[in-house]
UniProtKB/Swiss-Prot annotation:
<keyword id="KW-0217">Developmental protein</keyword>
<dbReference type="GO" id="GO:0007417">
    <property type="term" value="P:central nervous system development"/>
</dbReference>
<dbReference type="GO" id="GO:0008407">
    <property type="term" value="P:chaeta morphogenesis"/>
</dbReference>
<dbReference type="GO" id="GO:0005667">
    <property type="term" value="C:transcription regulator complex"/>
</dbReference>
<dbReference type="GO" id="GO:0003700">
    <property type="term" value="F:DNA-binding transcription factor activity"/>
</dbReference>
<dbReference type="InterPro" id="IPR036638">
    <property type="entry name" value="HLH_DNA-bd_sf"/>
</dbReference>
<feature type="domain" description="bHLH">
    <location>
        <begin position="24"/>
        <end position="90"/>
    </location>
</feature>
<dbReference type="GO" id="GO:0007419">
    <property type="term" value="P:ventral cord development"/>
</dbReference>
<dbReference type="InterPro" id="IPR015660">
    <property type="entry name" value="MASH1/Ascl1a-like"/>
</dbReference>
<feature type="region of interest" description="Disordered">
    <location>
        <begin position="1"/>
        <end position="32"/>
    </location>
</feature>
<keyword id="KW-0238">DNA-binding</keyword>
<comment type="function">
    <text>AS-C proteins are involved in the determination of the neuronal precursors in the peripheral nervous system and the central nervous system.</text>
</comment>
<feature type="compositionally biased region" description="Polar residues">
    <location>
        <begin position="1"/>
        <end position="10"/>
    </location>
</feature>
<dbReference type="InterPro" id="IPR011598">
    <property type="entry name" value="bHLH_dom"/>
</dbReference>
<dbReference type="GO" id="GO:0006355">
    <property type="term" value="P:regulation of DNA-templated transcription"/>
</dbReference>
<dbReference type="GO" id="GO:0007400">
    <property type="term" value="P:neuroblast fate determination"/>
</dbReference>
<dbReference type="GO" id="GO:0046982">
    <property type="term" value="F:protein heterodimerization activity"/>
</dbReference>
C-alpha cells in the first residue's frame, strides 16, 4: 500500500515538471523562433528572384538544376554570394555610364569653346574691315581735296569771279563734302567746276 502511493506521487511530480517545461513562455518563444526562420526564408526566396538568370548561370559554373524554376534551389550562402556579385556588376555599369556622360559633356564643352573662338575671330575680322571702311578715310580725302582746291583759287591774284558762280561753286562743293566726297565721278565734277571757273576768269 505504501509502495503504490509512492509510485503515484512520483508520476504526479513528472507531470508537474513536464507542464512547467511546456509553459506559456516557452510556447511563445518557440513561436517567435518559427516566425523568424520563416521571415528569413522568405527574404532569401525574394532575393533569389531578383538575381538574373545569367548571373546565376555564370556563377554556378554551368551546373544544371540551379536557379529560378530549377529543381534545386540556391543555398543561402550561394544566394548571398550571387547577390553581392550582381550588385558589383551593377555598380560597374553605373560607373561606366557616368564616365561616358562625363566624356560627352567634355566634348560638348570643347565644341562650344571652339565655336566661341570662331565667333570671336569673325567678329574681330569684321571689326578690322569696318575700320578700313570707316568714314575717317573719306574725311581725310575731303580735307585733302579741300586743301587742293584752296590753292587753286589763290594762284590768280586779283581775280574776282562772279558772285553767282562763286555761290554755286561753294554749294556744290559743300554738298560734295557732306554726302559722297569719296566718289570718283564727283571728284571729276569738282575739278570741272574749278576748270570752268578758271576759264571764265
Amino acid at each position: 500500500m505504501a509502495l503504490g502511493s509512492e509510485n503515484h506521487s512520483v508520476f504526479n511530480d513528472d507531470e508537474e515538471s513536464s507542464s512547467a517545461f511546456n509553459g506559456p513562455s516557452v510556447i511563445r518563444r518557440n513561436a517567435r523562433e518559427r516566425n523568424r526562420v520563416k521571415q528569413v526564408n522568405n527574404g532569401f526566396s525574394q532575393l533569389r528572384q531578383h538575381i538574373p538568370a545569367a548571373v546565376i548561370a555564370d556563377l554556378s559554373n554551368g551546373r544544371r538544376g540551379i536557379g529560378p524554376g530549377a529543381n534545386k534551389k540556391l543555398s543561402k550562402v550561394s544566394t548571398l554570394k550571387m547577390a553581392v556579385e550582381y550588385i558589383r556588376r551593377l555598380q560597374k555599369v553605373l560607373h561606366e555610364n557616368d564616365q561616358q556622360k562625363q566624356k560627352q559633356l567634355h566634348l560638348q564643352q570643347q565644341h562650344l569653346h571652339f565655336q566661341q573662338q570662331q565667333q570671336h575671330q569673325h567678329l574681330y575680322a569684321w571689326h578690322q574691315e569696318l575700320q578700313l571702311q570707316s568714314p575717317t578715310g573719306s574725311t581725310s580725302s575731303c580735307n585733302s581735296i579741300s586743301s587742293y582746291c584752296k590753292p587753286a583759287t589763290s594762284t590768280i591774284p586779283g581775280a574776282t569771279p562772279p558772285n553767282n558762280f562763286h555761290t554755286k561753286l561753294e554749294a556744290s562743293f559743300e554738298d560734295y563734302r557732306n554726302n559722297s566726297c569719296s566718289s570718283g565721278t564727283e571728284d571729276e565734277d569738282i575739278l570741272d567746276y574749278i576748270s570752268l571757273w578758271q576759264d571764265d576768269l
